[in-house]
Amino acid sequence: MITVADSNLERPWGRYEVLSSSDIHQVKNVYVLPGKRLSYQRHEKRAEHWFIVTGDARIILDGDSFEMSAGDSIDIEIGVAHRIENIGSEELVFTEVQTGTYFGEDDIERLEDDFGRS
């Protein structure tokens, strides 16, 4: 069964909203403020696909850094360390499609975090 959620969750780097979820997927729109970045993290139970909707991003995957912009997308496999940073002057928006067996926020192993979260 697919659930359409109405959650808009604030974070120190911006916010995200869950668009839909089921036992095998979750879809979010993520909004990152200019100059902010998410934690450098990895997941044990889910892979992610990111599609950049608007803005400019710096992506780090297992230590490799590259830039992406609107229309670009990337796959992040389970266990791969990753981070996204808004390098533009406007809000960065990307759609995140998660697939796997568990989508809770406790499936985040933070390797580095600008906001002191573990």
Model-derived segments and their meaning:
Residues 38, 64-66, 107:
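Short beta-strand segments
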Residues 45-58, 62-63:
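Glycine- and acidic-residue-biased ligand/ion/polar-headgroup-sensing regions
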